């Protein structure tokens, strides 16, 4: 216990000695005390000069911030960037705050170049009066041109699209006015006499001189509506005309003459012996060769096969003989021309 008390009690004199050694003389004050004394002295001694100096520094700082804000506003707005770039360089590069080559003086100059927008009532009234005066001066000219040029006004009116009501009114007027539209024309003219036509069949000699043509003549419709209603429209007709007229004259002189016409009848099967013989005799070449001659005049049909429908009993003898032109099982009749 006594040793512990001595251990705790021994350092006390040394601590006291150190504290005494750290104490400074009154002529050597500490850094914090000197700083505090300097601040107090500046506040007391400043007075009016200090206040004006602080106000000037604050104003300069505000102007710098405003210039910086205008710089950013002009640079990032496309509509005003051109006017900002077009401003002449009034200040030197030393005045630039460090953001490019623009200075605060350039920004102020560009701001002065902008024209304010007139929003006052007086300015609007003045503009309205000027516009009214212009309209008064221009109105007589418009009236003169409208009087001197009526055709141009009607042409402009025609160019405008018609409304549905106007279209309906024009349609009703055209219906009740009784005027026939120009598109409808009579099929043929009733004033011209009909030419004589020949109904005789064309012969081999005059067939090249005959050609089909339309007996239709177009002419303009009459001007009055009564004649147009009185004359009925005729249908279109097609006639065969003779160009030289020889056939028509000959037919008129000779009167009616009968021309034989051959009408070929179709073969009909009666189901008799002929059909059975015709179907069975197709392959009886030996009997056919015995009955038929050796050939025609030139012997060209001797080796040919028979044709279906020509191997009957009654017509076996005709095989190999040349038939005249137009010969066929038919009936002849004539018609009047």
Swiss-Prot record:
GO cellular component entries: plasma membrane
Family of this protein: Belongs to the BIG GRAIN 1 (BG1) plant protein family.
Region (Disordered): 1-32, 120-163, 179-233
Highest rank taxon of the organism: Eukaryota
Major localization class: membrane
Protein name: Protein BIG GRAIN 1-like
InterPro entries to which the protein is assigned, alphabetical: BG1-like
SS bonds (residue pairs): none
Keywords, comma-separated and alphabetical: Auxin signaling pathway, Cell membrane, Membrane, Transport
Record keyword Cell membrane present: yes
Composition skew (Basic and acidic residues), residue ranges: 137-146
Single GO BP term: positive regulation of auxin mediated signaling pathway
Keyword Membrane included in the entry's annotation: yes
Low complexity composition bias: residue spans: 150-163, 195-209, 219-230
Biological function: Involved in auxin transport. Regulator of the auxin signaling pathway.
Location of this chain's protein in the cell: Cell membrane
